[in-house]
């Protein structure tokens, strides 16, 4: 039986050695953002001695005259239109409570989802009694943020056929700040797997289906055995995402695909070794720079 022993070493993060974080204006609590009184105070800032000061550690974002600080490490703060992946935690009267990595549990109303088969009608008492047959505790779903309440709680909906219960796959939890906002967060990668990049930091990796079960209305999960080749692709993608997160790189379809291709010379179990992880991420970053430039 082979045994490998590794000793801890003083290793600098890849971002420090590359020194490429100069584009972002990073601040810590107490830093002065600006002394100009013409700007408006946003989230993560406060006024002190006629200066705008940061109250959290993060990156400064400006929208016209509004300045706010986006925290680097925080729980998910919902916005209307966000795509999220969540887990059902409780079945209540005419609603489900969903864990979405936010401060409060999110809510999915019975009236905010498609009925099995995509039937369009008013929800009846029979539908309410059958709620646990639709979704029960522990089920994973993909949904869209419909509304955000004053206390920060999020209301979800799954009215589109692309949302609904998730079948077989792997869930990876990352910081929401590392998921890049795009027009679409559902990606079928050419390597044979698909990913759902939730804005809440929950990433779902699953084998690409041969045909879409649109007539099921998002309730029938495919429980057929997953082939060994698909499981290896999913495992490699999972380790690649963890590698990108460890080196604080943004997650989107191109960065994940480039990292997957860079990891092909290595075994799946070796991807998480620090030296191989840095090699793969550095090659990924170089390809992204060549694409941008």
From Swiss-Prot:
Pfam families: ECR1_N, KH_6, RRP4_S1. Its main location: cytoplasm. One of its GO terms (molecular function) is 7S RNA binding. Residues 79-159 form the S1 motif domain. GO terms for biological process: CUT catabolic process; exonucleolytic trimming to generate mature 3'-end of 5.8S rRNA from tricistronic rRNA transcript (SSU-rRNA, 5.8S rRNA, LSU-rRNA); nuclear polyadenylation-dependent rRNA catabolic process; nuclear-transcribed mRNA catabolic process; poly(A)-dependent snoRNA 3'-end processing; positive regulation of cell growth; RNA catabolic process; RNA processing. Keywords: Cytoplasm, Deafness, Disease variant, Dwarfism, Exosome, Nucleus, Phosphoprotein, Retinitis pigmentosa, RNA-binding, rRNA processing. It is found in: Cytoplasm; Nucleus, Nucleolus; Nucleus. One of its GO terms (cellular component) is cytoplasm. It comes from the Eukaryota. SUPFAM superfamilies: Eukaryotic type KH-domain (KH-domain type I), Nucleic acid-binding proteins, Ribosomal L27 protein-like. Belongs to the RRP4 family. It is linked to Short stature, hearing loss, retinitis pigmentosa, and distinctive facies: An autosomal recessive disorder characterized by childhood myopia, early onset retinitis pigmentosa, progressive sensorineural hearing loss, hypothyroidism, short stature, brachydactyly, recognisable facial gestalt, premature ageing and mild intellectual disability. Component of the RNA exosome core complex (Exo-9), composed of EXOSC1, EXOSC2, EXOSC3, EXOSC4, EXOSC5, EXOSC6, EXOSC7, EXOSC8 and EXOSC9; within the complex interacts with EXOSC4 and EXOSC7. The catalytically inactive RNA exosome core complex (Exo-9) associates with the catalytic subunit EXOSC10/RRP6. Exo-9 may associate with DIS3 to form the nucleolar exosome complex, or DIS3L to form the cytoplasmic exosome complex. Exo-9 is formed by a hexameric base ring consisting of the heterodimers EXOSC4-EXOSC9, EXOSC5-EXOSC8 and EXOSC6-EXOSC7, and a cap ring consisting of EXOSC1, EXOSC2 and EXOSC3. PANTHER family: EXOSOME COMPLEX COMPONENT RRP4, PNAS-3 RELATED. Non-catalytic component of the RNA exosome complex which has 3'->5' exoribonuclease activity and participates in a multitude of cellular RNA processing and degradation events. In the nucleus, the RNA exosome complex is involved in proper maturation of stable RNA species such as rRNA, snRNA and snoRNA, in the elimination of RNA processing by-products and non-coding 'pervasive' transcripts, such as antisense RNA species and promoter-upstream transcripts (PROMPTs), and of mRNAs with processing defects, thereby limiting or excluding their export to the cytoplasm. This is Exosome complex component RRP4. It comes from Homo sapiens (Human).
């Amino acid at each position: 039986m082979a045994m490998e022993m590794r000793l801890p070493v003083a290793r600098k993060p890849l971002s420090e050695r590359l020194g490429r974080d100069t584009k972002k204006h990073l601040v810590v609590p107490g830093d002065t953002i600006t002394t100009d009184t013409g700007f408006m105070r946003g989230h993560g800032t406060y006024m002190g001695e006629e200066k705008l000061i940061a109250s959290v550690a993060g990156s400064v974002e400006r929208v016209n005259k509004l300045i706010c600080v986006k925290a680097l490490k925080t729980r998910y703060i919902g916005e209307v239109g966000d795509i999220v992946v969540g887990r059902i935690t409780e079945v209540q009267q005419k609603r489900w409570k969903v864990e979405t990595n936010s401060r409060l549990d999110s809510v999915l109303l019975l009236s905010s989802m498609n009925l099995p088969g995509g039937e369009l009608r008013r929800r009846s008492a029979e539908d309410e009694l059958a709620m646990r047959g639709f979704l029960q505790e522990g089920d994973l779903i993909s949904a869209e943020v419909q509304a955000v309440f004053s206390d920060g709680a999020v209301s979800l909906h799954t009215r589109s056929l692309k949302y609904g219960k998730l079948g077989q796959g792997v869930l990876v939890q990352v910081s929401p700040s590392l998921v890049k906002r795009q027009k679409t967060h559902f990606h079928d990668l050419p390597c044979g797997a698909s990913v759902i990049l939730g804005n809440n930091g929950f990433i779902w990796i699953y084998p690409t289906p041969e045909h879409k079960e649109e007539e099921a209305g998002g309730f029938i999960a495919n429980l057929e055995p997953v082939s060994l080749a698909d499981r290896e692709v999913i495992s490699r993608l999972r380790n690649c995402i963890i590698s990108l997160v460890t080196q604080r790189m943004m997650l989107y379809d191109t960065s994940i695909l480039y990292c997957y291709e860079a990891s092909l010379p290595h075994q799946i179990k070796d991807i998480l070794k620090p030296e191989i992880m840095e090699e793969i991420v550095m090659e990924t970053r170089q390809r992204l720079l060549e694409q941008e430039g």
